[in-house]
Regions:
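Active-site anion-handling motifs in enzyme catalytic cores
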Residues: 1-176
Length: 176
């Protein structure tokens, strides 16, 4: 969970009877989760987070669950442009604090940052961002990345994906 998500929940928790946290990787914020155990239903996308949330006295199949990342539920056919594959490989490595090395590859396209921002609650913009990312990836045979959702989308598109770790366990944990 990013700090923006934490801050949003912290500032709005009083407005809701229950809060459903969709599949996430969560590190820290133990006070938030302990203090709101009666309000939260947490979906984890990997075992490290699942074990962490259980350690805060959440009960499996009651208020903590494990499931796949939401990207796996995407109806890909709604977004395909059916562009032919005509480029060899895309380097889509992080250029932010989650980069493991900060060593950026030649011709790097941190495409997730292109559409990052505060507009993910706008369904139209979110769908178009997803479409643009998929259309970009469609052109390539191979995708090299340390971004989780780029790796998932490229895999769903049938690309050869070389998936690298980020600065903490998220990528490896979701992969496993």
């Amino acid at each position: 969970m990013y700090s923006e998500g934490h801050d949003f929940i912290q500032n709005n928790i009083g407005k809701f009877h229950k809060v459903i946290i969709m599949p996430s990787t969560i590190r820290g914020y133990s006070d938030l989760f302990i203090n709101n155990i009666d309000k939260f239903v947490v979906f984890c996308r990997e075992n490290i987070t699942f074990d962490y949330i259980k350690s805060l006295n959440y009960e499996p199949n009651k208020n903590v669950f494990i499931t796949d990342d939401m990207a796996f539920y995407l109806d890909l056919n709604k977004y395909l442009s059916l562009k032919p594959v005509y480029k060899k490989q895309a380097n889509c490595f992080r250029t932010d604090s989650e980069s493991l090395t900060g060593d950026y590859k030649e011709n790097n396209h941190d495409i997730s940052l292109t559409w990052n921002g505060d507009y993910w609650d706008n369904e139209f913009l979110a769908r178009n961002s997803t479409r643009c990312m998929i259309n970009f990836l469609e052109e390539y045979k191979v995708v090299n990345t340390d971004r989780l959702h780029v790796a998932i989308l490229a895999s769903l598109l049938g690309k050869e994906v070389n998936f690298y770790p980020n600065s903490y366990y998220k990528n490896e944990a979701v992969y496993n």
